């Protein structure tokens, strides 16, 4: 049975336009709320036969939609009916703005938990649209919104991961390490052990890619999420 889905705002509303931000936001909140309600209405049974709401993760796309995605995520989860529901969101570390986005999400999660709400989850990815963002910004004469080399992207990933795994942060915003890089995975594993936050960490990979990695992680009882298109 399905217990976890990942969606994008363009997948639930195709008429997004920067010229009508408030309308886009209101429509997306309405549609994301409907998905959250169904996730709660049709729970799954975990390994101990407890019923739990299905998990919904809000993915990121182009840089131009990042602010809208963040605002929709926070506004929807601020609705009273979702106070006790846990949902996730992606942060792309190929964006220099990723640090400020993470800061915003951590502040939101801390306030939410302090007021009696459920914890949330942040899925750290490096980003899949680096070439497209670079070409698009060049064609339009805009400043490039992404780092232009892999070293900076990788360093930013570890920088955000360091802060995400701090005990006070990890307890209110769990972490999904989305990577097939052995160094990144080992780094996250060892750092989570040092901070004693292993229960707040999951490793997320694509089904069928580097199959030895999930096998090894499973052998040492790590939480693993495998993504596959449906």
Segments the model singles out, each with a brief description of its role:
Residues 1-230:
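Positively charged, amphipathic and often flexible ligand-engagement surfaces
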């Amino acid at each position: 049975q399905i217990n976890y889905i990942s969606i994008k705002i363009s997948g639930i509303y195709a008429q997004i336009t920067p010229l009508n931000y408030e309308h886009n936001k209101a429509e997306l909140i309405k549609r994301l709320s409907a998905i959250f309600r169904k996730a709660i209405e049709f729970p799954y049974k975990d390994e101990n036969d407890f019923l739990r709401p299905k998990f919904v993760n809000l993915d990121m796309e182009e840089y131009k939609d990042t602010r809208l995605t963040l605002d929709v995520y926070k506004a929807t989860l601020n609705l009273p009916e979702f106070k006790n529901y846990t949902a996730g969101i992606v942060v792309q570390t190929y964006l220099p703005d990723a640090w400020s986005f993470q800061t915003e999400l951590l502040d939101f999660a801390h306030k939410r938990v302090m007021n009696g709400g459920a914890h949330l989850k942040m899925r750290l990815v490096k980003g899949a649209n680096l070439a497209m963002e670079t070409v698009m910004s060049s064609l339009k004469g805009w400043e490039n919104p992404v780092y232009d080399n892999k070293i900076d992207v990788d360093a930013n990933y570890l920088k955000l991961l360091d802060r995400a795994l701090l005990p006070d942060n990890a307890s209110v915003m769990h972490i999904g390490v989305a990577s097939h890089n052995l160094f990144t995975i080992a780094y996250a594993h060892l750092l989570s052990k040092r901070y004693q936050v292993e229960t707040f960490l999951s490793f997320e990979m694509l089904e069928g890619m580097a199959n030895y990695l999930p096998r090894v992680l499973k052998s040492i009882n790590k939480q693993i999420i495998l993504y596959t298109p449906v």
